[in-house]
Structure formats: structure tokens, C-alpha cells
């Protein structure tokens, strides 16, 4: 199950409540992913590990050469820049780039059901069960005397 927490925000001068997704515990490690993949394929965990370790460099090489990277069943990765603005087109160029990030877009499939079109994004199942995450309080532990 996935977790959400309640958050209070100000909107148009009034307090409103909403929720945001939160994670719990440590992220799933590369080693754990390799074991899951090896258990469900014919590849060994060490082969999967070597492949996953090579993936970022191969993706970087292709993206720095102007290509996006699409992983079937997962989605597409591409560079996204934030840049300063100038008044004249002649001044616009690489020197305006302040930050470069990787933009990820989950793969999308569209299915026609009668007259409706249903869009589904990779990595987002239809049946996520959400539970409110109650952060443990940071109060001091008390000991019982017997």
C-alpha cells in the first residue's frame, strides 16, 4: 500500500487541507531490484546488476548527443534546462543556461472503451490503496517501573 500525509496550506488567504504522497523507510536498493528481476527472468542477479550500473552512462551519452531515452514499459528521459532571459535574440545561447535536469515522463497507453478513451501511465497501477501515514511522535519514551 502507498502512503499519504495530510498537509495544511494557505489558498486565497484561507487555510485548506490536502494530502501529499510520502515514502516510508529506505528506498529499494539496486541490489534488491536486481534480485527481484533475476527471480522473474532468466538473467542472473550479477548480470542484471552490471546492466543497471551501465545504464546511466549509456543514457547520459545519448542525451548529451541530443536524444531522449525511452525505456519500454517505463517511460522517456530527456534533458530540461532552466535559463535566464535576454532582450535580443542574438544574445540567446548556451551561456544563459542556469540548471540542467533530467525530465522523466512515464510511458502512456491509450485504450478505447466504447466512446471513451482511457489513458494509463506506466508505474501507476489502477488500484493503488492509499493509507494516511501517521508520523510517530518524537516524545520521550517512558519506562515502566515494576
Task: Please report, for each region that a protein language model flagged, where it lies by residue.
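Strongly charged
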Residues: 1-50, 57-146
